[in-house]
């Protein structure tokens, strides 16, 4: 590998603002912000959605019992398609 062409890999703190959770993850993301966590200063990045706040992972997912668009089309216009012209 060529020296000095790869981004610096380091531990970064990601802050899920909607769940107010902090994650320490190895990353090459560039950021100017820093945060002190557990007595150590880390690069800091805010995110809006993570596994702690996304409905799929939290189990608070909304389910919709709507029929699909193809079924709605058949319901509205099914008679026109099958009707004989004449």
UniProtKB/Swiss-Prot annotation:
InterPro entries hit by this protein: Ribosomal_bL28/bL31-like_sf, Ribosomal_bL31, Ribosomal_bL31_B, Ribosomal_bL31_sf
GO BP annotations, alphabetical order: translation
The keyword Ribosomal protein appears for this protein: yes
GO molecular function: structural constituent of ribosome
Family: Belongs to the bacterial ribosomal protein bL31 family. Type B subfamily.
Subunit architecture: Part of the 50S ribosomal subunit.
Protein name (database record): Large ribosomal subunit protein bL31B
């Amino acid at each position: 590998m060529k020296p000095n062409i790869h981004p610096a890999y380091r531990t970064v703190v990601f802050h899920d603002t909607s769940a107010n959770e902090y994650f320490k993850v190895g990353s090459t993301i560039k950021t100017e912000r820093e945060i002190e966590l557990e007595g150590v200063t880390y690069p800091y990045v805010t995110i809006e959605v993570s596994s702690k706040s996304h409905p799929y992972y939290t189990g608070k997912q909304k389910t919709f019992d709507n029929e699909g668009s193809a079924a709605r089309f058949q319901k509205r216009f099914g008679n026109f398609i099958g009707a004989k012209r004449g």
